[in-house]
């Protein structure tokens, strides 16, 4: 069974069947901000440490990978809804088409369903400590379409992955969310360790530019609904976020926008996720109102990685071997090196020679990130 192929020219792996045997994952980010994303947009994000800097949830070894970076679409005339990636809604593949292009530190997932096409580009800009999801939604039908879009992320309640998952007597009581302008803000331990600006540097935000926000949720249970899953959130099914915020429960960021597309018309929505305070988030979101910013950042990302990979090239009679050595093996080595090979959990310590051998041909002039300290249990 074939699920995809290598695009040698663009240095991408193309997945043209979304029902892969397991999630096929790409890396996004830098030493300061990292993210993992599957071909169906599952995955998580972290600041500096996958163990102690987690800002969005991911459940390992679950029934396929959940949750992730989801954008839901709803036709308000038919009340039918789907997601801009095959999962989590999971429409039948005889009517839903999806293609994922995993590139060098970016992923593009396109979909086509019910006369509406979408293309979502996920990436972390060079030098930035936040991530961007740019969604372009197009009406390919011959009539106007009234749609609602829902961008969704499930926040962790603690930076520490283990604490967030198991120490519920603590983590459920230290977080709240609020809606400010065009974003959801999450506040963690808000009375702990504030600096002169009033920030404890543990605020997260999920914002959107490109269209007015018509609804929002900061409480996970109110967005998903009782006895439901990511595949059928009550807010999406009913076509309306309730505006409920989180206090002493599980947090999320959900932003709704209602749009009307004429035949052939497209709409661009830009979602941004990161660990920033309100003022920083406002500045970041305002910068994405500039036309062409996303295209310029993605092009800069490609140029950066492609030039790095071109430092060392092999040539053999096998194009497949050349591609693996020149692109994907090298890219894997670089990313895991700068994350100390500990994106998920652990101390981040490894033997010294193998990571150095892995990146020396690419002239990587960076010291590996400091070893992460294993978390201590808090009461």
Question: What do the predicted segments below correspond to?
Answer:
Residues 1-364, 373-379:
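Anionic coordination/interaction segments
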């Amino acid at each position: 069974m074939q699920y995809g192929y290598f695009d040698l020219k663009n240095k991408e792996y193309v997945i043209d069947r979304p029902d892969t045997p397991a999630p096929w994952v790409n890396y996004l980010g830098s030493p300061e901000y990292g993210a993992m994303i599957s071909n169906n947009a599952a995955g998580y994000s972290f600041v500096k440490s996958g163990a102690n800097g987690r800002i969005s949830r991911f459940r390992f070894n679950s029934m396929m990978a959940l949750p992730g970076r989801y954008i839901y679409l709803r036709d308000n005339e038919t009340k039918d809804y789907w997601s801009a990636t095959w999962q989590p809604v999971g429409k039948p593949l005889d009517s839903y088409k999806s293609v994922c292009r995993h590139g060098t530190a970016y992923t593009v997932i396109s979909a086509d369903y019910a006369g509406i096409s979408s293309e979502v580009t996920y990436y972390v800009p060079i030098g930035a400590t936040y991530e961007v999801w740019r969604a372009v939604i197009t009406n390919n039908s011959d009539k106007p379409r009234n749609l609602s879009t829902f961008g969704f992320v499930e926040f962790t309640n603690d930076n520490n992955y283990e604490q967030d998952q198991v120490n519920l007597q603590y983590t459920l009581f230290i977080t709240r969310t609020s809606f400010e302008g065009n974003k959801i803000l999450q506040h963690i331990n808000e009375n702990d360790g504030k600096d002169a600006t009033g920030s404890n540097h543990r605020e997260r935000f999920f914002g959107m530019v490109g269209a007015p926000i018509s609804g929002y949720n900061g409480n996970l249970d109110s967005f998903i609904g009782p006895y439901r899953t990511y595949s059928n959130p009550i807010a999406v099914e009913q076509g309306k976020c309730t505006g409920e915020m989180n206090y002493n429960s599980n947090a999320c960021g959900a932003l709704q926008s209602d749009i009307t597309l004429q035949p052939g018309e497209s709409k661009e929505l830009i979602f941004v996720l990161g660990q920033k305070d309100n003022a920083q988030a406002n500045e970041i979101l305002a910068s994405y109102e500039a036309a062409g910013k996303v295209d310029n950042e993605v092009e800069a990302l490609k140029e950066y990685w492609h030039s790095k990979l071109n430092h060392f090239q092999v040539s053999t009679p096998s194009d497949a071997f050349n591609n693996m050595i020149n692109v994907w093996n090298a890219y894997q080595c670089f990313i895991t090196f700068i994350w100390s090979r500990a994106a998920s959990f652990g101390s981040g310590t490894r033997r010294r020679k193998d990571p150095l051998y892995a990146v020396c041909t690419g002239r990587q002039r960076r010291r590996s990130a400091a070893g992460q300290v294993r978390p201590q249990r808090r009461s």
